[in-house]
Amino acid sequence: MNKRMNELVALLNRYATEYYTSDNPSVSDSEYDRLYRELVELETAYPEQVLADSPTHRVGGKVLDGFEKYSHQYPLYSLQDAFSREELDAFDARVRKEVAHPTYICELKIDGLSISLTYEKGILVAGVTRGDGSIGENITENLKRVKDIPLTLPEELDITVRGECYMPRASFDQVNQVRQENGEPEFANPRNAAAGTLRQLDTAVVAKRNLATFLYQEASPSTRDSQEKGLKYLEQLGFVVNPKRILAENIDEIWNFIQEVGQERENLPYDIDGVVIKVNDLASQEELGFTVKAPKWAVAYKFPAEEKEAQLLSVDWTVGRTGVVTPTANLTPVQLAGTTVSRATLHNVDYIAEKDIRKDDTVIVYKAGDIIPAVLRVVESKRVSEEKLDIPTNCPSCNSDLLHFEDEVALRCINPRCPAQIMEGLIHFASRDAMNITGLGPSIVEKLFAANLVKDVADIYRLQEEDFLLLEGVKEKSAAKLYQAIQASKENSAEKLLFGLGIRHVGSKVSQLLLQYFHSIENLSQADSEEVASIESLGGVIAKSLQTYFATEGSEILLRELKETGVNLDYKGQTVVADAALSGLTVVLTGKLERLKRSEAKSKLESLGAKVTGSISKKTDLVVVGADAGSKLQKAQELGIQVRDEAWLESL
């Protein structure tokens, strides 16, 4: 029976690849169904012989308890956005300062959810959401129900790949029809539907909704020397890669492609929101490197956002965690990019003056970055009142005088005891990119603050399970989960805490970079400004902000209290050791290693202070080679780069 089951699995997986990946099926649907039913019968009779790559894994229902957090071995960066031809020209100019004759590759920007797939010895072991780029959620069981994701690869590879999971428009229409018939609210757009589906705890629901994927990158160090070759390699492994792409030598060719895609956009079977432009050569990518937040070798051109007219009804003014007072417009409801919009940001007081926005104006509304509703401009021909908007002079939260500094565009409350600032700081501290305390969202924080149970972030760690039961709507099970989530967050690596403190100019990526160098928040608090400013990608503004923060008595007390409650202040990731053997060197691994796994070799190099990259460039300092090193060894020799073997690495 085992032989027949092997034959059926191999056949069915081949036919599935032909159907979903190649769009060239060699058998009829009825023949596929017949073979599938035969396999199901055999697996029912011999459950102990079910194979790991059996296609039946995709349809079985399983109710999950939840999604565990998963640390990405290779971080997922955001891309810099571009909204005009001029911004693309500026990107090209920056690239050409480092790379003389770049070739670009242009790919469609799929409007879906970023995913990371990890295979060990060719078997899918982890499917993870993007999350904050460093930590995502393990949704492996759900992604196994996406029919075009291979459960096994044709080679026994250890590899991590990146892509987008999306809902095709046809599937979206079918899902919404079913929801309508069942009296359920319809999804606003395919992206929301895909997101909601991947968050399902019942995997059978995922299997029914016909999600799909496009893969676009090998995240683990690539064995190919260009993005285009990497995409072709992904296709060879059985992944679906979007065929709509071009290689371009200049911005004129890129702009023509963007215009062509823009005209075809509405006729595609899936949603896109732009075009991603990357430097094709991976060695050139290594030369260009990264900013703190994004690669310097790529940009995402976003199509112009949909615009609608709405009438301004009133303006609300709210205080953020840094004291900035932000105006929000209340509008007559309009449908915009698949959702109903009745509120939109007015950015700041200077923006209101610049756009001359007045009471009862008709305004143009759009979604900035296809996400945040914003007022773009006034329709002056429809103006009905000359009366200017009322600009507040006192903080809407604490009634302190508001200040408008000469070098700032916004009004600001500088009262350190302002309730709104404290509460927003607590919300930020618990948020996903900071301490990531599951369940401790704005509504719970507001209730805790109103009940005087928390006044600063250290108070969060003094809460007991019974404290949550004092809050309206919180039951015993929820209270237990909240308490457990708070306790679990104590073990976070310290960059999460540093970002959570809300220090001005210190975002999540900067926090990680700082802790890689200083290893703990206590060390960082003692560092001088010159030492901080000398770190690559940082500078004087960040250094001064840190110095100002840590110089206050309040910060010293807060860190002491956090430590006393058991919150970790140390960095748990790979640190940069200033005096390590390979400190500051850029190293490439190539060829087949005999004794070390590639991941082990990479970890060892990084522990010795090296930066491990996938491509050889003029910035490469050292190449560690195994058997069958091939073209990378040849290129290293041509460039005069130092070459070492596995035995040398083991001896360090």
Curated annotation (Swiss-Prot):
Active-site feature positions = 109 (n6-amp-lysine intermediate)
Q: Which Pfam families match?
A: BRCT (PF00533), DNA_ligase_aden (PF01653), DNA_ligase_OB (PF03120), DNA_ligase_ZBD (PF03119), HHH_2 (PF12826), HHH_5 (PF14520)
Show which residues constitute the signal peptide: none
Give the enzyme's EC designation: 6.5.1.2
Protein name per its UniProtKB record: DNA ligase
Q: Please list the residues that bind Zn(2+).
A: 395, 398, 413, 418
Q: Which cofactor does it need?
A: Mg(2+); Mn(2+)
Q: Which organism is it from?
A: Streptococcus pneumoniae (strain CGSP14)
Molecular function GO labels: DNA binding; DNA ligase (NAD+) activity; metal ion binding
Q: What GO biological process term is on the record, naming one?
A: DNA repair
> What InterPro entries does the entry give?
BRCT_dom, BRCT_dom_sf, DisA/LigA_HHH, DNA_ligase, DNA_ligase_AS, DNA_ligase_CS, DNAligase_adenylation, DNAligase_N
Report the sequence similarity comment from the record.
Belongs to the NAD-dependent DNA ligase family. LigA subfamily.
Give the source's domain of life in one word.
Bacteria
Q: What is the documented function of this protein?
A: DNA ligase that catalyzes the formation of phosphodiester linkages between 5'-phosphoryl and 3'-hydroxyl groups in double-stranded DNA using NAD as a coenzyme and as the energy source for the reaction. It is essential for DNA replication and repair of damaged DNA.
Any one cellular-component term (Gene Ontology):
cytosol
Instruction: For this UniProt record, give its keywords in alphabetical order, as a comma-separated list.
Output: DNA damage, DNA repair, DNA replication, Ligase, Magnesium, Manganese, Metal-binding, NAD, Zinc
